């Protein structure tokens, strides 16, 4: 099956969340750019919202650099956990781990109400130029959740004050 996109048309692009899927989305964006596909609206949630902002900025180079340089410590403070602890847990290789120590560290995270994502906030502020996004010819819509209300929110970023 051969997929053909009409490059005389302009498209809207929807991006999903899911952490590492963000790198895949940047690869798709690069392929669309190389194919000459135009877009005038992007919607996204979580990492899709971040990539959507980069798309609204028309800054593929910055997006590629972001994903090449990303590390776990750039998006969260792991507290007592090391990156190696996290990698081992994610791989499911618990046999070589001190489970008592790991459980103690996990309990500390729960007591502290989760991991500190201040590094993620700082990184997003560094990467996204809000003024460029708001003034872009690409309309950006993001889906998020209000933690206080526990309700979904849809935001048209270009129309924010």
Where are these regions (language model features)?
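Short, charged beta->alpha transition segments
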Residues: 126-132
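Short, conserved beta-strand segments within well-ordered enzyme catalytic domains
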Residues: 14, 76, 141-143
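Short coil/turn connectors at secondary-structure junctions
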Residues: 8-11, 136-138
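Patatin-like phospholipase
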Residues: 10-12, 19-118, 124, 152-161
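A short, basic/flexible loop-to-alpha-helix module at the beginning of a structural domain
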Residues: 1-7, 33
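Active-site gating loop/helix substructures
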Residues: 132-161
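Short, flexible segments with low predicted structural confidence
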Residues: 3-4, 91-96, 137-139
